Amino acid sequence: MELKLDTSKTYAIALEGGGAKGAYEIGVWKALEQAGVKYNAVSGTSVGALNGALMAMHDLTRAIACWRDIHLNKVMDLGALSEDDVKQMMSGQFENMNLTDLFSKALDIVRNRGLDVAPLRAWVREVVDVKRVKESDVQLYISTVSITDRKGLEVHVNELP
C-alpha cells in the first residue's frame, strides 16, 4: 500500500503523549517536512504538546537537538534513586538489585508525593519560546488536566493573553 499526501493541501496534525513517543513524532515531522507537507494546526497532549509547540515555532533543528540531548535528570529529580536504579527497574532486572533498598527509596518518593519535575519545567521554559508560539501562523491546541479541578482542559495557546 502506498500512502500519498497531497502537498497542495494544508493539514492539521495530532500528537499524543507517551514520553519516548516524542522522539518518534519528531522523526515523522522531519519526514513530513522533507515531503513538502504543510500544516497550519497542531494539537497535542503531554510530550505531544511540547512537540506541537516546537512545530508551531517551525524549529525542527531545535526539536532534533532536544531529543538528542534529553536525559532522565533533565526532566525529573530522582531523589535517592540513581539513573541506573531506574534503568534496572524499567528493564525488569530485579534479581541483581537490593530490593529492600529499592523499596525504601520508592516509599520516600510516595511520601514526598512523587518525583520532583522542576527540572522538566525549567527545560520546557528553555526550549519553548512562548512568544513565538503565540504569534505563529500555526494554531496550537493542547490537552491537559487541571490538577485542582481534576478535569480535562483544552487550550488554544495562540489565544492566551
Language model features by range: what are they?
Residues 14, 76, 141-143:
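Short, conserved beta-strand segments within well-ordered enzyme catalytic domains
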